[in-house]
Amino acid sequence: MGKRVLLIEDEPNIIEAIRFILSRDGWTVETHSDGATAVAAVAAKRPDIVILDVMLPNKSGFDILRDLRGMAEHSELSILMLTARGQKKDRDMAEAAGVSHFMTKPFSNSEMLEAVRRLAGLDRAQANDG
């Protein structure tokens, strides 16, 4: 596995935090901030994992998630969804749309890294050998 993440997020502080956390573990992190073109970015970049914010400019993360799950080539893609709200209805909507993992901001470095490793199917030994 190439260990590529596409981070679809519009908050610079969150982008830098996730890039820092994952790059130290050998992940290549590319970013995209516009909801309207996010599905095209996933198709173009072909990541192993997508980290998707709920609140984005021009299109919600829920709509992007539904669009991706509706496409055969992305139906099995690992998608981690982030939200600052953390309400049960958000988690329920994400699960109904086919999210792989749901995480609330703020998150710890270890929470993010463990979630991404789990979605990638990496155990601790493989991740540390990276």
Regions found by a protein language model. Give the residues of each.
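Charged docking surfaces used in two-component/phosphorelay signaling
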Residues: E16-R24
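C-terminal output helix
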Residues: F107-R117
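Active-site beta3 strand of CheY-like receiver
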Residues: K45-I51, L56
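Short hydrophobic/Thr-rich beta-strand motif most characteristic of the beta2 strand and flanking loop
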Residues: G26-S33, A41
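The feature encodes the CheY-like receiver
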Residues: I15, P57, Q87, P106
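Conserved acidic carboxylate
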Residues: E9
